[in-house]
Amino acid sequence: MPLPEPSEQDCESLRAGQEPSVGARKPQESSNLVPARDKERPKPTDVASQETSSTATLPNNTLQVAPVKKQGRIIHRKRSRVDAVPPQPLEFLKTPFGGRLLVHKSFLYKQEKAVGDKVYWKCRQHSELSCRGRAITRGFRVTEMRDHCHPPEKEGLDRKKRHRGRPPSSALPEGAEVQEDEVSLWLYPVEPEPTPQPSIETPEEEQGYRSLALQSLPPKKRPTPGVVRYRPLEFLKTCYGGTFLVHQSFLYKREKTVGGKVYWTCREHAVHGCRSRAITQGQRVTVMRSHCHSPDIEGLQARRQQEKTIKKIQARRIGAGDLEDCDDIEDSLLQGVDSLFYRRGQGTLTLSRSKSKSKSKSRSKSKSKSRSRSRKRAKKQQESSQEPPEEDQDVDPRGPEFLKTPLGGNFLVYESFLYRREKVAGEKVYWTCRDQARMGCRSRAITQGRQVTVMRSHCHPPDLLGLETLRQREKRPGPSQWDGPEGPEFLKTPLGGSFLVYESFLYRREKATGDKVYWTCRDQARMGCRSRAITQGQRVMVMRRHCHPPDMGGLEALRQRENFPNLTHWEGPEPLQPLEFLRTSLGGRFLVYESFLYRKEKAAGEKVYWMCRDQARLGCRSRAITQGRRVMVMRSHCHPPDLAGLEALRQREKAPSAAKKKKKKKKKKKGIH
């Protein structure tokens, strides 16, 4: 009996009630691989698995698709070439801020730079553990440059992969928060949630059109039915005109904007070192890291109260028709010492409305001003007579006190505290506490004419001794402080600069303003010495004392070098032997001199300046200068030479040349054949 055609078999299977599927068509596609019936040898598993789905309902005589010439033989299709194994793609992970990390052998690398089609990567633990692991990617190829100094992060990597491989969740509500993995929230008193707004029912036709429109949106952007919509994000104004983001009783200050995303950092980042971050996109908030401190509930309530007061006054002025003076609302609140700004000191929170008299006076004053603003242009003389007395404004009749700084600037003195000038905006001058950098004090002050407004309280007592010293210096300006007749002494530095020598101390030049030259102590970075000096012609004035004794040995060595300059290496003809250079792993080059490695620092004319490779790791201060084939070393090394590393670099330098020779030999052989 002849076999039916494949189309007839499909029709019969459809008549029997079977649905056509992808598995039913596989035997037709894989007809190049045909098994022959053999009772002794079992059928291959791959062919049997392809045919069982389609031949389960067919009779046994239809199992043979093509005539078989030899039993027990599998006929394979001919292949013209061997299928090459495709290269494995690189694996990357996304960072919380939109970047990417390279995953290679359970190590994480962050991108450093890209040159052409090469991308250079360095270990993610480079800053924390000083790991020098490097990698270079070119297409799908990864080249490791150095070994890691720590084990691979297998547990954290598996956790990140599990987090990345989770199925996409339903659409988030507009006010909901997205909490990243590995982030635990700080326990704090939670604010009462707003009551959900009941949704208004829409007709069936509108719901139908709306459902059709929502089907065209991506799954993540479709609103989930039954989800409560929360209130929009809350923002508060800063005292300098910026905005704070309020989220779960924490305050965030704006950092940057990238596209539709706004990045925020915790306001306590500088004070407490808090590393919490937030990203807002529309009404959605994503918190990156947890806070290391509790929220300032009292301060937040004070800021909200201040915001409400500003809005009330603005509404009153708009209702009275004074649209031109709406920008001066905050100025009226800034009269006095603290106004509505809270103090973050010890004890309970106190606002600056403690006196009942000041309350009544401020109210009557705001009412009288709101009535007289419309007549402001015509009655300027009457307005000057209607101004309240200076007692109500907390204005010192003598004005604020200013003192000269040792370097020629100005200090603001208020309540025995010293403030340094920060910026000027219109008639307002903004000041910061002098001890901001040293003690982290966040106190600010604003001066406008004779008015002084303090923003935050100080975290330290006033420096009365330093204040009295500045006042005495102001009363008796010091021609006696200038050292006159002899004149200052100068010495050459090893790199061609100049040192100021005064009372056996060495000073490094900082800047020059007019005929004055400002100098800092040479040991400022090493010992934190804050001594300063100013030279004007032949006069020298020292500002602060040194915190260390003078370096007599170093001073004598500099004087000897000044008297007997070491120019033996530079005199005479150039040496015949060329300098040795080695390639770095990132494409630069090292200078090799007396088995030490130097990294290029700068070039000035024909001279090239080099510094020791181990400057950052070991603090070595050795320097070298090359001019042609001549080398001059400035300081000795504080460590022995790294002979093993030098030999490894030399072997790496020789390896590419050997590979090139092999390639040339192969090309020659092919040309001969």
Swiss-Prot record:
Description of how the protein assembles with itself and partners: Interacts with CTNNB1 (when unphosphorylated), perhaps preventing interaction of CTNNB1 with TCF4, and thereby regulating transcription activation; phosphorylation of CTNNB1 may inhibit the interaction.
Location of the region described as Disordered in the Swiss-Prot/TrEMBL record: 1-62, 147-178, 351-402, 646-673
Keywords: Centromere, Chromosome, DNA-binding, Isopeptide bond, Metal-binding, Nucleus, Phosphoprotein, Repeat, Ubl conjugation, Zinc, Zinc-finger
Gene Ontology BP term (one): negative regulation of transcription by RNA polymerase II
Protein name (record): FLYWCH-type zinc finger-containing protein 1
GO MF term list: DNA binding; transcription coactivator binding; transcription corepressor activity; zinc ion binding
Gene3D superfamilies for this protein: 2.20.25.240
S-S pairs: none
Biased composition (Basic and acidic residues): 147-158
Principal cellular location given in the protein's record: nucleus
GO cellular component: cytosol; nuclear body; pericentric heterochromatin; transcription regulator complex
Mapped zinc finger ranges (FLYWCH-type): 92-150, 235-293, 402-460, 490-548, 581-639
Basic residues bias locations: 354-379, 659-673
UniProt keyword Flavoprotein present: no
One Pfam family recorded for the sequence: FLYWCH_u
Coiled coil: none
Modified residues (Phosphoserine): 21, 294, 339
Cross-link Glycyl lysine isopeptide (Lys-Gly) (interchain with G-Cter in SUMO2): residue positions: 110, 666
Subcellular location: Nucleus; Chromosome, Centromere
Composition skew (Polar residues), residue ranges: 47-62
Top-rank taxon: Eukaryota
Function: Transcription cofactor. Negatively regulates transcription activation by catenin beta-1 CTNNB1, perhaps acting by competing with TCF4 for CTNNB1 binding. May play a role in DNA-damage response signaling. Binds specifically to DNA sequences at peri-centromeric chromatin loci.
